[in-house]
């Protein structure tokens, strides 16, 4: 769904473990890393989209996570001109995103990047909470910063609780 201003409605997903680290995934066949995200389909709510994308991209079901927070407002970024598909109608100039902070409640081995027939990611790892803000592609940085700033109090409270057996090493599934 692209709005009148040219922004595609989308959700962003931040999954954290009990150590306050976040799930960071590498785009399939590329060198870029990002959080899971995906477009809202006609008739879907942001929460329904989040669960659909979570399953399609990461292989996790609603019972594998707990929603901790949702951004109060839509966060927007514009695409660089080189990524705007001219000739498509309507023209999408960027994304407007509702972000979800989730707590992983299952074993990390339940992550399955190959769940769909067309994987979005080919590798993943746990990283420190603020790492993605510095390391995502430049045109997404401000949205990441705003989402993470809003989620920080909740995520930091979670990481101050005793760990529940979560490992913090890199996990590869492909």
UniProtKB/Swiss-Prot annotation:
Which keywords belong to this entry?
Answer: Hydrolase
Residues that span the membrane, as ranges: none
- One of this protein's GO BP terms? mRNA catabolic process
| Domain called Nudix hydrolase: residue spans | 6-149
Enzymatic class: hydrolase
The Swiss-Prot or TrEMBL record annotates one GO molecular function as: mRNA 5'-diphosphatase activity
Which regions form coiled coils?
A: none
Renumbered to this chain, motif Nudix box spans 38-59
Recorded E.C. number(s)? Answer: 3.6.1.-
GO annotation, cellular component aspect: cytoplasm
Name the needed cofactors.
a divalent metal cation
UniProt lists the family membership as follows:
Belongs to the Nudix hydrolase family. RppH subfamily.
Query: What HAMAP family has UniProt attached to this entry?
Result: Nudix_RppH
Q: What does this protein do?
A: Accelerates the degradation of transcripts by removing pyrophosphate from the 5'-end of triphosphorylated RNA, leading to a more labile monophosphorylated state that can stimulate subsequent ribonuclease cleavage.
Provide the protein name: RNA pyrophosphohydrolase
* Organism, as annotated: Pseudoalteromonas atlantica (strain T6c / ATCC BAA-1087)
